[in-house]
Amino acid sequence: MYPAHLLLLLAVCVSLLGASAIPPLPLNLIQFTYLIECANKGRRTSFNYADYGCYCGIGGSGTPVDKLDRCCKTHDECYAQAEKKGCYPKLTMYNYYCGEGGPYCNSKTECQRFVCDCDVRAADCFARYPYNNKNYNINTSKRCK
């Protein structure tokens, strides 16, 4: 084997090792994204909710800053209930469809139905309440006590 081939093989192996260290996204995150966009008729993408208030996004603490943030807290609590039932809400794939009235669940197993219901209720809640740009990317250490 030529030295250039060895270098190329080494580069491929190193990049594969690096890629294997990247944690995967939760499997149902894409589904939740579609449910959000279905519920609000495309007015806002799911990215608007990734870092909103004290509870939208990873983790959560303190008092929700508004009704929209309360939707995220309720969604977190719903996922906690799913885990108590032995479900894995961030990994559970489910069947749903987007109708004129918004998203609907169409899943067979109890865990799929429960997790889908959590996500549909959150998506509908997001669509129901106004979005306040001032609550996006807030300083959670100061405002979420």
Swiss-Prot record:
Keywords: Calcium, Disulfide bond, Hydrolase, Lipid degradation, Lipid metabolism, Metal-binding, Secreted, Signal. The keyword Disulfide bond applies. SMART domains: PA2c (SM00085). Residues 1-21 form the signal peptide. It is an enzyme of class 3 (hydrolase). InterPro entries: PLipase_A2, PLipase_A2_Asp_AS, PLipase_A2_dom, PLipase_A2_dom_sf, PLipase_A2_His_AS. It holds the Pfam family Phospholip_A2_1. Residues 22-27 form a propeptide. Binds 1 Ca(2+) ion. It is found in: Secreted. The active site is at 75, 119. The keyword Secreted applies. Disulfide bonds join 38-98, 54-144, 56-72, 71-125, 78-118, 87-111, 105-116. One of its GO terms (biological process) is arachidonate secretion. Ca(2+) binds at residues 55, 57, 59, 76. PLA2 catalyzes the calcium-dependent hydrolysis of the 2-acyl groups in 3-sn-phosphoglycerides. Belongs to the phospholipase A2 family. Group I subfamily. D49 sub-subfamily. This is Basic phospholipase A2 PC17.
